């Protein structure tokens, strides 16, 4: 499903972010991002769709609201 593809894409994005900034997401973020995913938590920009999570859903409060830009030209089913 498209939700599964988006969640996999977000998981890869988080893994990349953790390389640069370890500890900015909870250790069990793969499970949390699936449990806390709400398809209505998004907004559109000229560049693409921004999917966001609430504070403390997948990361410490100090990390703020995690946002993930999914560019319009991205093919998440290949992630």
Where are the model-predicted features located?
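Compositionally biased intrinsically disordered regions enriched in Thr/Gly
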Residues: 1-79
